[in-house]
């Protein structure tokens, strides 16, 4: 299917997180956060590399102590992907990691301290050309805002953000992005919508503490999907109580589904029924596992019978339609070959990899010509 996305993205200014542009019409970047002990350098580096291999543009690392800041120095030297240092409570930690090549500083206005401390972080960031993320969170609002509103609300999140915006403007510092996160979908969406209409700074999207792999994926897909459909968002993190690699995969699935970015295989598969001529679920599981390394955008249809099989298969780069006695493989909308149930996964994998290689070569030729 070739229906174009109707989404018109919100205009925002652009900042650079390392070599990744955020805002200003740049592709929506996908990021995650390590959940290792930062002082365990080997484990943290290994996880960052796994996250990067999954397709991350940016990785955030928690820096809860000066020891972690010293570990960050070694981590920074070991990986090339842009790194964000997540700082809470102690502003001096931000000053320390700034010396070690961090690409962005995340500070929480609810716990970073008074204006003098914020000024120190801003002055350091300006000197070293490091952007800042103002990360407002419903679970850690300033005490006076908690008292004023009684509980976290969209307006409380927005007011917290504007306090920092005003002070950053007073300091003539504009290299920053914002996030206004809550675990409640409605609160988060309303807060982002309110602030998006009033400022042009890039926005980092997320539903904080969304839950485990299944529930967190659902919550994040609804909340972030609503905002992305509105054209709001310049970078995103799907927060899951799961392996961070899953956060990257879900984030890419969201962007692919909304036709905002494309990476890897877009599988179209039927849920299967008694009409299926092969085991659709088993086939899909095997294909997803085998083809996880492919990054070139492709559409692959796996349909178990002739009801919708030929129609869906014709719209895909590679399509499989169940049939008897043999199943039919389509390529670029045309019947290509027949395959038996016993060999269909191997046959599909071979054709998909060949097609992916051709697409990569075509893309390389286009780049060379330009």
Curated annotation (Swiss-Prot):
Keywords, ordered alphabetically: 4Fe-4S, Iron, Iron-sulfur, Isoprene biosynthesis, Metal-binding, Oxidoreductase
Superkingdom of this protein's organism: Bacteria
Coiled coil spans: none
Residues involved in [4Fe-4S] cluster binding: 270, 273, 305, 312
PANTHER family: 4-HYDROXY-3-METHYLBUT-2-EN-1-YL DIPHOSPHATE SYNTHASE, 4-HYDROXY-3-METHYLBUT-2-EN-1-YL DIPHOSPHATE SYNTHASE (FERREDOXIN), CHLOROPLASTIC
Function: Converts 2C-methyl-D-erythritol 2,4-cyclodiphosphate (ME-2,4cPP) into 1-hydroxy-2-methyl-2-(E)-butenyl 4-diphosphate.
Name the record gives this protein: 4-hydroxy-3-methylbut-2-en-1-yl diphosphate synthase (flavodoxin)
Upper lineage: Bacteria, Pseudomonadati, Pseudomonadota, Gammaproteobacteria, Oceanospirillales
């Amino acid at each position: 299917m070739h229906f174009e996305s109707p989404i018109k993205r919100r205009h925002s200014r652009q900042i650079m997180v390392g070599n990744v542009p955020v805002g200003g019409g740049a592709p929506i970047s996908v990021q995650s956060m390590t959940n290792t002990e930062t002082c365990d350098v080997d484990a943290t580096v290994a996880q960052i590399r796994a996250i990067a291999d999954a397709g991350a543009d940016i990785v955030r690392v928690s820096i809860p102590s000066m020891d972690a800041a010293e570990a960050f120095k070694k981590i920074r030297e070991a990986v090339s992907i842009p790194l964000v240092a997540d700082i809470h409570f102690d502003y001096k930690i931000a000053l320390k990691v700034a010396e070690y090549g961090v690409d962005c500083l995340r500070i929480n206005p609810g716990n970073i301290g008074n204006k003098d401390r914020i000024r120190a972080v801003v002055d350091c960031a300006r000197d070293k050309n490091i952007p800042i993320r103002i990360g407002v969170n419903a679970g850690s609002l300033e005490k006076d805002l908690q008292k004023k509103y009684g509980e976290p609300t969209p307006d409380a999140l927005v007011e917290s953000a504007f306090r920092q915006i005003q002070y950053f403007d007073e300091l003539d510092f504009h290299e920053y992005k914002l996030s206004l996160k809550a675990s409640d979908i409605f609160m988060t969406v309303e807060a982002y919508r309110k602030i998006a209409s009033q400022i042009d700074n890039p926005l980092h999207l997320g539903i904080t503490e969304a839950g485990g792999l299944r529930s967190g994926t659902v919550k994040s897909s609804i909340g972030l999907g609503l905002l992305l459909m509105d054209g709001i968002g310049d970078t995103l993190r799907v927060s899951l109580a799961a392996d961070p690699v899953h956060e990257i995969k879900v984030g890419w699935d969201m962007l692919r589904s909304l036709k905002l970015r494309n990476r890897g295989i877009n599988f179209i598969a039927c849920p299967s029924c008694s009409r299926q001529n092969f085991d659709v679920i088993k086939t899909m599981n095997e294909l997803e596992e085998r083809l996880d390394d492919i990054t070139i955008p492709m559409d692959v249809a796996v349909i178990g019978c002739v009801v919708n099989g030929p129609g869906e298969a014709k719209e895909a780069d590679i399509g499989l339609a169940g049939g008897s006695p043999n199943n039919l493989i389509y390529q670029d909308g045309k019947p290509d070959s027949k395959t038996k149930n016993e060999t269909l996964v191997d046959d599909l994998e071979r054709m998909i990899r060949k097609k992916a290689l051709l697409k990569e070569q075509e893309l390389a030729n286009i780049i060379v010509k330009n």
